Amino acid sequence: WDNTLRFRHLLWDQGLHLAEAMDTAQRGAGVDWHTASELIQRSLTEARTHPLKPRVACGAGTDHFAIKQLQSEAALIAAYSQQMEMIEAAGGQCIIMASRALPAISAGPDVYARIYGYLLEQAAEPVILHWLGDVFDPALRGYWGYQDIAKASTAVLSIIEDHQDKIDGIKISLLDQTHEEAFRKRLPSDVRLYTGDDFNYPALIAGDGNHYSHALLGIIAAIAPALVQALEALAK
C-alpha cells in the first residue's frame, strides 16, 4: 500500500488528477471489489492531505456480483448503486463503468436508458460515463443496445442529453479517432469527452481547433513527467 500511494503522490505532485480503480476495478489483474474499494478509500484519504487537492474519480461497476445474479434491471441498479454510494461516501467522483451484465441479458436501448437514467438522477454530483469497446473486452459488444456503433452513439447521446446536468463527461475507449472526433462534436457544450484511445491520444488531446478530448487513460502514468511538460507547452 505504501508504494501504491507513494506513486499517486508523484502524479499529484506534477499537477495531474487521478482516475482510480478503473482497470483494477475491471478485475483484469484479479483485484476484487473488496480490494478495489480499499484502494479507493486510501487514495481519497491521501488526496485530501495533498496541497494541490487533486481530483479523484473512481470506477463504479457491478462486478461484486456474478453476471447470473444480474438478470433484472432492479438487480443491476442495486449493484451499481452500492459501488457508487461507497465512492460518494468516501468523497470521490463516480465513473460509471460498462457492465458485462447488460450485453449478457441482451439489453435494448430502452433498458440502458432506464438504468442509467436512474443512476444519474440519484448521483450526488455529476459523473463520468465510460464506453469501453469490444476491442478491449469482447463481452461488451453491443453496448448501449446496438451492435452498430452509429446507432449506439445516438443511444448514449440521448441519455446524455436527457441528464446532462448530472454528467461531467464520457470516456470513450473505442480506438477509433474518426468516430471520437465526430462524437465529441455532438456532445452538449458543457459535457467533456475523455479519451481512452491509447493509439491516437496525442492528436485527440491537441484537438482540431474547435474541439478537443480530455485525457483519461493509463498511458499517462507511465509518461507523466514528459506529458506534463507537453501539456504546458500546448497551453501556450
Range-by-range predicted roles:
Residues 124-236:
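Catalytic alpha/beta core domains of metabolic enzymes, predominantly
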Residues 1-150:
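Active-site beta->alpha loop and helix N-cap motifs at the rims of alpha/beta catalytic domains
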